[in-house]
From Swiss-Prot:
Subcellular location: Cytoplasm
UniProt lineage: Bacteria, Bacillati, Bacillota, Bacilli, Lactobacillales
Protein name per Swiss-Prot or TrEMBL: Ribosomal RNA small subunit methyltransferase H
Gene3D superfamilies with a match to the protein in the record: Putative methyltransferase TM0872, insert domain (1.10.150.170), Vaccinia Virus protein VP39 (3.40.50.150)
Residues given in the record as S-adenosyl-L-methionine binding sites: 35-37, 55, 84, 105, 112
Species per Swiss-Prot/TrEMBL record: Streptococcus pneumoniae serotype 4 (strain ATCC BAA-334 / TIGR4)
NCBIfam families: 16S rRNA (cytosine(1402)-N(4))-methyltransferase RsmH
Domain of life of the native organism: Bacteria
Catalytic activity: cytidine(1402) in 16S rRNA + S-adenosyl-L-methionine = N(4)-methylcytidine(1402) in 16S rRNA + S-adenosyl-L-homocysteine + H(+)
GO cellular component: a single term: cytoplasm
MF terms in GO: rRNA (cytosine-N4-)-methyltransferase activity
Catalytic class of the enzyme: transferase
Length: 316
């Protein structure tokens, strides 16, 4: 595997083991990334089993073709270069009507963060980009330089939950009147100018939340996850499972809400039984999110904010 695609998979065994993999089953890795989850899942399949792996980043697919070569030779893997929000349409096109399990590792992957030219990191000077799909048209540059004040405030509050959203949006407006804001370093410095001294002393980079907000906007991450997870629940076979790893509160709240809605039912009191069409489709496999072990936290700094939630299909 090439150095630039080194990626330490978070919650590797927990995510796949909780899928209760059937050796002859059909499975999906919705977020191929460094292919760690895919590789471990494939190790649990027989040659009759099959994995469909999604990624909109061609570099990730190229890397995975090397890492998963032994399984590809056996015809056990199909790569799909597309946004996972098109999960159902892509799988139907591949002739798949039902799946036995699917895993999601939401957010940006380590290789994307580590590749300076992708413009995801506030720690490395690069053009403002942040596209997970390099063929997409909307970039971080467009958001920062063309969104009006009110739209900037909206995404900074909604996706970054930054209490200085208004001040940062105003400072961006002022800066871009002089010249376009072109690089990650320029943007990070503008954000630093707004934050008071006591905020700058806090743990974590002062630009982290704003960069997260712009990245989510550029890639419509929450909208895509919402659509995809709902499609996955529809496509699951009975007893099939979904594992979702999240890395920030917005992703986790979305996942928790989707799973809660699918696993609970509101019916009038006094009904002698629940009609089939009102029965919940899903069941929570774990009431609380599964967190990384102490060993993983020590070995991989990026696992600190990870949470894993799992549901099982109990009713069609």
């Amino acid at each position: 595997m090439t150095k630039e695609f080194h990626h330490v998979t978070v919650l590797l065994h927990e995510t796949i083991d909780m899928l209760d993999v059937k050796p002859d089953g059909i499975y999906v890795d919705a977020t191929l990334g460094g292919a760690g989850h895919s590789e471990y899942l494939l190790s649990k399949l027989s040659e009759k089993g099959h994995l469909y792996a999604f990624d909109q980043d061609q570099n990730a697919i190229d890397n995975a073709q090397k890492r998963l070569a032994p399984y590809i030779e056996k015809g056990m893997v199909t790569f799909i270069k597309d946004n996972f929000r098109h999960l159902q349409a892509c799988l139907r096109e591949a002739g798949v009507q039902e799946i036995d399990g699917i895993c999601y590792d939401l957010g940006v992957s380590s290789p994307q963060l580590d590749q300076r030219e992708r413009g995801f990191s506030y720690k490395k000077d690069a053009p403002l980009d942040m596209r997970m799909n390099q063929d997409a048209s909307l970039t971080a540059y467009e958001v920062v330089n063309n969104y009006d004040y009110h739209d900037l405030v909206r995404i900074f509050f909604k996706y970054g939950e930054d209490k200085f959203s208004k001040q940062i949006a105003r400072k961006i407006e002022q800066a871009r009147e002089v010249k376009p804001i072109e690089t990650t370093t320029e943007l990070a410095e503008i954000i630093k100018l707004v934050k008071p001294a006591k905020e700058l002393k806090k743990k974590g980079h002062p630009a982290k939340q704003i960069f997260q907000a712009i990245r989510i906007e550029v890639n419509d991450e929450l909208g895509a996850a919402d659509e995809s997870i709902q499609q996955a629940m529809d496509m699951l076979a009975l007893d099939g499972r979904i594992s979702v790893i999240t890395f920030h509160s917005l992703e986790d709240r979305l996942t928790k809400q989707l799973f809660k809605e699918a696993s609970t039912v509101e019916v009038p009191k006094g009904l002698p039984f629940i009609p089939d069409d009102l029965k919940p489709k899903m069941e929570l496999v774990s009431r609380k999110p599964i967190l990384p072990s102490a060993e993983e936290l020590e070995a991989n700094n990026r696992s600190h904010s990870a949470k894993l939630r799992v549901v099982r299909k109990i009713h069609k």
